[in-house]
């Protein structure tokens, strides 16, 4: 299992790099995005061109989740995402990316115990990638590879907005 966590930008981007590399080798990739519902992002738009080796599924609203007080809808969507991840894992994709799963746990959309149970059930031949800030120690301990992303410099801090095709 791979974990990309930390306060910096680029965690999803790193996971998508693995996805692209995997698809390039003819492998099957499934991405499950928690807390995301935008269809104008590059990883969503490319899905039709890379199918059937690449699938992406979103379990979030189009707007932002209130991290201090997530809605009941946000919690239900996250639970649906976790159930979907369980189902899709048994199709045995080569790579299963659980994007923003760490943050979904940190803000209380999902319980860590539920996530650990899912990870126990995933067939061993499926490579799992988990992204998001605030990865719990239990997930990092379980990982074969864990990376903490830290911004040294970021255009957003200068007031430069996110660029299509780069940050989304």
Regions found by a protein language model. Give the residues of each.
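Conserved P-loop
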Residues: 2-87
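Residue-level preference for the first positions of well-ordered beta-strands
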Residues: 1-3, 28, 94-95, 127
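Phosphate-binding/switch region of NTP-binding enzymes
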Residues: 135-168
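Conserved nucleotide-binding/hydrolysis micro-motifs of P-loop NTPases
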Residues: 35-38, 62-64, 102-103, 134-137, ...
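Hydrophobic/aromatic ligand-binding patch that stacks against planar heteroaromatic rings
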Residues: 21, 46, 118, 138-139
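Phosphate-binding/switch loop-helix module in NTP-utilizing enzymes
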Residues: 66-127
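Conserved D-loop beta-strand region of ABC ATPase nucleotide-binding domains
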Residues: 131
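Short, glycine/charged-enriched secondary-structure capping and boundary segments
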Residues: 17-18, 44-47, 71, 110-114, ...
